[in-house]
């Protein structure tokens, strides 16, 4: 079973600071990172900056399409017109098919705001107590997460994985 987690930080650079800790956990085989992305939202900006993470030791990237669609749904709906907003609203229902429910989306929208940042990780096989203990040594964070069933994870990989065929 995979977990999609957003590690929310009270500073715009907290997510970047946590990367070394997360990579150390991966090297110690305490967590298996499938894919990840960072959102930074400087206080003087209307919209956040997003960046997909590329690490050769992560097991299998979902690709930019997944992160682009997720971040569009999470952060850019307030900035688009009603017609596009309605289409993205329908997309929210589609994400629930992958185990990314309305509660996860709502919490991220409410908590990742100007002046904050978030490290988004899709992980599996975490040794939870050791991961939580290691993260206590980094910047203060709040965890927002949702668990995916094996079927939902497979569906995500099929739809958005690097090996996925292009849809017309």
Annotate each PLM feature:
Residues 1-117, 123-168:
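Positively charged, small/polar-rich N-terminal and surface patches that mediate targeting and assembly
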């Amino acid at each position: 079973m995979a977990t999609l987690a957003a590690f929310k930080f009270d500073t715009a650079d907290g997510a970047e600071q946590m990367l070394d800790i997360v990579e150390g956990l991966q090297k110690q085989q305490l967590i298996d990172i499938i894919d990840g992305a960072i959102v930074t939202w400087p206080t003087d900006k209307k919209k956040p900056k997003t960046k997909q993470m590329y690490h050769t030791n992560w097991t299998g990237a979902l690709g930019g399409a997944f992160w682009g669609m997720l971040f569009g749904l999470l952060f850019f709906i307030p900035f688009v017109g009603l017609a596009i907003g309605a289409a993205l609203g329908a997309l929210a229902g589609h994400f629930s098919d992958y185990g990314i429910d309305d509660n996860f989306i709502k919490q991220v929208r409410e908590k990742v705001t100007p002046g904050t940042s978030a490290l988004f990780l899709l992980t599996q096989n975490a040794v939870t107590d050791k991961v939580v203990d290691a993260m206590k040594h980094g910047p203060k964070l709040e965890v927002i997460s949702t668990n995916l069933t094996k079927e939902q994870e497979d569906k995500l990989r099929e739809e958005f994985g690097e090996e996925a065929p292009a849809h017309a």
